Amino acid sequence: MKKTKFLLVAVDILPEAIRKTAEVKELLSKRPELTVNEAVEKVGISRSAFYKYKDGVFPFYHKASGKIITLALNLEHRAGVLSKVLNFIAQYQGNVLTINQNLPLGGIANVTISIETEEMKVSIEELLEALSQMDGVSKVELVGQS
């Protein structure tokens, strides 16, 4: 049995047909009422190109949904910053499994949080982006998933 090998590649270096295949798949997942014909027409790719690549193109965070992810964050040493982060995760149905916070050094605390993502109401990518924009959060990084 052939084992499939995966690579993490920046989208801007991919050929147009593969990028557009990913766009069609995203469009179909967000708008299930669309047919493949309608989606490929909207994106501007042929049906044959879509069918050629569709089984080999996945968003990076797609494989992590329904799984456990581990985030590493740098938080400012101020009252309420960690609480706001945890409340935000809970607001979108992320289930916090573990929290490890180191003593603050230079006004920054390193925090590692493991989250079960199965019931989350936002994508992992959206969660990471929103957390990185929060006041008091200077770094957010996905360091593991299982």
Curated annotation (Swiss-Prot):
Domain of life assignment: Bacteria
Position of the signal peptide: none
ACT domain mapped to chain residues: 70-145
SUPFAM superfamilies xref list: ACT-like
Cysteines joined through disulfide linkages: none
Family per similarity comment: Belongs to the UPF0735 family.
Protein name: UPF0735 ACT domain-containing protein CHY_1913
Organism annotation: Carboxydothermus hydrogenoformans (strain ATCC BAA-161 / DSM 6008 / Z-2901)
